[in-house]
Amino acid sequence: MNGAAGGVTQAKMTAPKDQDPWSQDEMLTLIQTMKTLLPSQDNSKFKTTESHLDWNKLAFKNYSGSMCRQKWMEISNEVRKFRTLSELILDAEEHVRHPYKGKKLKKHPEFPKKPLTPYFRFFMEKRAKYAKLHPEMSNLDLTKILSKKYKELPEKKKMKYIQDFQREKLEFERNLARFREEHPDLMQNPKKSDVPEKPKTPQQLWYNHERKVYLKLHADASTKDVKDALGKQWSQLTDKKRLKWIHKALEQRKQYEGIMREYMQKHPELNIAEEGITRSTLTKAERQLKDKFDGRPTKPPPNSYSMYCAELMANMKDVPSTERMVLCSQRWKLLSQKEKDAYNKKCEQRKKDYEVELMRFLESLPEEEQQRVLAEEKMVRSRSGQADKKKAADERAKLPETPKTAEEIWQQSVIGDYLARFKNDRAKALKSMEGTWLNMEKKEKIMWIKKAAEDQKRYERELSDMRATPTPTTAGKKVKFLGEPKKAPMNGYQKFSQELLSNGELNHLPLKERMVEIGSRWHRISPSQKDYYKKLAEDQQRVYRTQFDTWMKGLSSQDRAAYKEQNSNKRKSTAKIQVPVAKPKLVAQSKSDDDDEDDDDDEDEDDDDDEDEDKEDSSEDGDSSESSSDEDSEDGEENEDEEGEEDEDEEEDDDDNESGSSSSSSSSADSSDSDSN
C-alpha cells in the first residue's frame, strides 16, 4: 500500500513530459509569491481564496500563470486540508485568552459605545409617540414617515440633535483612545500589504474631497445620502473646475509610477507588468479636455463632403439624425462642380493650418506626451512624410469627376422622393428605381440620355484642359492608379539596395550615410553574389511585365488614356530637367572611384524614393518617410519618369533590363562591377 501511495505522490509532483521539471527552489518561489498575493484578512475557505487569485501575476521565468496553477494543484493535493483536534484546541485556547480580538472587539464590555447620529436621536425620541398615533403601521412605514419628518425639520431644531451628537462623538473618541492604551493587544491592526496604493481617477479625487465637505455640513448623512447628493454633480462641473482634478490625478499617477518602480526593484519575483504601472487614469473625454486647454488644435473634417455636412448640420438641430444625412447627401449632389471645388480648397487649407498648429503644439510638450499625441494622430516618425502623402492625395483629387450614365443622373434627381416613400430604406429605394427605369419608355429617357452626353463632354473637356496645362505638382509628381503593380528593380545593384533598405539594418544611419554604406558593401561583395542579385532583378522584371500587361488590359479606355498621357507629359518634363549638372559636392573630388560611389548614392536615393512613392498608398507607416527631403524627392521623380517610359514601351524594357533605368544607375552598376573585379 505504502509503495503504491509513494508512486502516486511522485507521479503528481513530477511535471509533464512537455515541460521542464520544477526544482525545489522554483516551487518555494511560487509559494512565497502566493503569500504576497493573499488578502490581509484571509478568513475565507481556501478554495474561495484560491479561485480569486490572479494566476498571471504569479508567472515567473518560463512558467506561465496556467503552469503555476497546475503546479499548485499538484502540491496542494499532497497536503491535508482538515484540522486535527490538537490544532483546533490551539485556536480555542487563543479565543479564550482574547475573546474580543478582531471583529468581536466591539462586544468587549469596556469598549466605548458609539454615539447615535442626529437622525437616530430624533427617531428614538419620536418613535413611541407615532407608534401610538398609528398602531396599524408597520415599523417600515413608521421609519419612512419619521425620515420624511426629520428632513422637513427647520435647521434650528435640527441643530439641537447635531450638537448633542458632536458632543458625544468627542467623548467617544476620548474613551476609545483610553481603551487602546489599556488594551493594546486587542488593538493590533493586521499587517497590511506594502504594495503602493493605485492612483485615483479625477472623479474619485473630487468625490473624496466633496464627501468630506458634505459630511461636515450633514454629519448625520448616510453613505447613500452622500452618493445621491454628489452623484450627478461631477458631470455638471465646468471644464475649468474639472481640469483642476485632472491635473491632480496626473500628478498622483506620476508619483505612483516612481514609487512602483522602486517597489518592483525590491520585489522582482512579483513579475508586475509595465502596462499596469503606466496605465492612464483619465478617460478619453478627460484626456481630450486637457489637450484642448493645453492648446491642441481641433482636427478638421477629412474631406470636403464632411465639411459641408458639418456646416449644414449646425443649422439642422431640430431635424432627426437619419433625415439629416439624407438631406446633406441630396444638397451636396445639387451643388455645382465649382462649389464643390471651393469646399475642397477650403478643406485642404484647413488641413494645412491644422498641421502647422499641431507641430507647434507638439513642440510645447515633453517627449513622452509627444509620442502619445503622434500615436493618436497615426503620424509617421518623420513629419515630412505626411506632407508627401497629402500631396499625392491632392493629385488624385484633381482628376476630373467620372461621367455619369443616364440612369445615374435620373436616379440622382428622384432619390429623395423614393427614400421618403420607403422610409429611408436605401436598398429598397434603389431596387424600385431600377425597376422604374427598365419599364420607362424611350421618349421619357431621351432627356436623361442628353444630360449624360453633356456630362461625357464635360469630362473630356476637363481632361483635355488638365493635359494641356499641367500644374507643377501634376507634372512633377506621379498620380497613383488603383491596382498598378509595384515596379521591380532594374538591375542587381537596385535589388541589393532595396534588400538592405527594407530589412532595417541601416535605419540607425542618416540617409546619405546609408547610401554610402550600401555603395561600399556593393563594392565588397563577390562577382558571383552580384550575378545572383542581377538574376533576382531579371526574374522580378519578368513578373512585373506580366502583371503590368494584365493590369493595362483591365483598365478602361479613359483610364488607359490618362495613364499614357501622364507618362508622355513626364517624358517631356524630364527631357528638360535631365541636363547633366555637376553637384557641388563632386567638384572637389578627383578620383574616379569616389565619383562612381556618389553615382551609386544617387541611384540608391532614387530607389529609396521609389519605395517611398509605392508605400504612400499602403496602410503602414515606416522608416521610408525619412527619405522625403527635396533633393531626394526630385531624384525619385526622375527615376519614376524613366520607369514609366519603360512600362509603356515593352521593347525598351527588354533592352534596358540589364543596363538599368537611367544612365546614372547603369554607370554605377558597371563601375562597381569593374571595381570589384
Curated annotation (Swiss-Prot):
Task performed by this protein: UBF recognizes the ribosomal RNA gene promotor and activates transcription mediated by RNA polymerase I through cooperative interactions with the species-specific factor SL1. It binds specifically to the upstream control element.
Annotated Myb-like domain residues: 14-76
Complex formation: XUBF consists of 2 polypeptides of 82 and 85 kDa, encoded by the same or closely related genes.
CDD domains found in the cross-reference section: HMG-box_UBF1_rpt1-like, HMG-box_UBF1_rpt2, HMG-box_UBF1_rpt3, HMG-box_UBF1_rpt5, HMG-box_UBF1_rpt6-like
Subcellular location: Nucleus
Acidic residues bias spans: 593-658
Protein's UniProt name: Nucleolar transcription factor 1-A
InterPro entries in the cross-refs: HMG_box_5, HMG_box_dom, HMG_box_dom_sf, SANT/Myb, UBF1
Ranges of compositional bias, category Low complexity: 659-671
GO MF term (any one): RNA polymerase I general transcription initiation factor activity
GO biological process, one term: transcription by RNA polymerase I
GO cellular component, one term: nucleolus
Lineage: Eukaryota, Metazoa, Chordata, Craniata, Vertebrata
DNA-binding region: 112-180, 196-264, 298-362, 400-467, 486-552
Gene label: ubtf-a
